[in-house]
Regions:
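N-terminal accessory/capping or targeting/presequence segment of soluble
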Residues: 2-105, 117, 121-262
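Acidic beta-strand-to-loop metal/phosphate-binding motif
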Residues: 108-115, 267-273
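Acidic, proline/serine/threonine- and glycine-rich low-complexity intrinsically disordered segments
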Residues: 280-285
Length: 287
């Protein structure tokens, strides 16, 4: 499909789901600087291949916001697509949030994939929408619904980093985290950034180009450590070593249902700038 055809298909799905405005970030599910091919929804829907930018799709317009590094490239790649270029930082050019505030009205609905927008930004948008009498829908990956030949999620083999190179065992690192949790009065700790998880568990992978990380989430409580990842990427010996250190492997995408099981009075440590919106749903007390 051409970019125009993709946008038309997206608009049809938006209409079916009664979503008036759809936001498409560049982000993956982990706030990574570089993203794998599976996550390049903004590239797919606009044709713009730069590393930074956001798209907003409505029934009567489509826009791309990007910074000064990409003005020339974006203008060339968007030509003939019907996607309008918004040059970030230029005079009289609204930010994405300013644009949404202007366009959204009573009874309208803003949608985005809640796995790709941070909890912090989702809170800001929720507040903005409340003032406008609009609603938010974050359960659907609409671009994924029309992307027929979408690349698969990466599942590169995981390796274990020997403690002589890591400098500290994962057991000792996890003990230090739990001590910090106790000092802060936290019952749980949710970690979503891939480099932090790789460091904490002394594992390395190849799921992001030029970055030795493993697609995963980690949840730690006072008694459990749960790693949400594709078990097929782990050898039997690494799975056994992780198990001996108290780490249980669960399916990668089951994190979203798991966080909903948190007790309402459970206090959870997480970074709302990095953790995505859907990783915080069901969590009332966040530090």
């Amino acid at each position: 499909m051409t970019v125009k055809e993709r946008i038309t298909a997206l608009r049809e799905v938006m209409a079916e789901k009664k979503i008036d405005v759809y936001l498409v970030p560049t982000d993956d599910f982990h706030a990574s600087e570089y993203v794998g091919e599976y996550f390049k929804c903004r590239k797919y829907i606009t044709g713009f291949t730069g590393s930074a930018g956001r798209a907003v799709i409505m029934q009567d317009m489509a826009g791309l916001w990007t910074d000064g590094r990409y003005f020339i490239q974006a203008a060339a790649q968007l030509e003939g697509t019907g996607v309008e270029l918004f040059k970030m930082g230029e005079p009289d050019v609204p930010t994405v949030h300013q644009f949404l505030e202007e366009k959204l009205g009573e009874g309208m609905c803003l949608g985005f994939d809640g796995r790709t927008v941070s909890a912090e930004e989702a809170d800001e948008l929720t507040e903005l929408l409340a003032k406008k009498g609009a609603t938010l829908q974050t359960d659907s990956d609409l671009v994924g619904e029309i992307w027929e030949d979408r690349p698969a999620l990466s599942c590169e083999p995981v390796m274990e980093l020997d403690v002589k190179w890591a400098g500290e065992s994962r057991a000792d690192k996890c003990a230090r985290i739990r001590k910090s949790m106790e000092e802060k009065g936290a019952d749980g700790f949710v970690l979503t950034s891939l480099d932090d998880i790789a460091w904490l568990l002394n594992i390395r992978g190849g799921d992001v180009h030029c970055c030795p990380v493993v697609l995963s989430y980690l949840v730690m409580t006072k008694t459990e450590i749960r790693l949400f990842a594709n078990e097929k990427a782990f050898s039997a010996s690494i799975l056994d070593a992780l198990f001996k250190d108290g780490v249980t492997i669960l399916p990668y995408d089951s994190i979203y249902e798991y966080v909903k099981t948190f007790e309402k009075d459970m206090t959870v440590l997480l970074c709302k700038k990095k953790a995505k919106h859907r990783c915080t749903r069901g969590t009332n007390k966040i530090k």
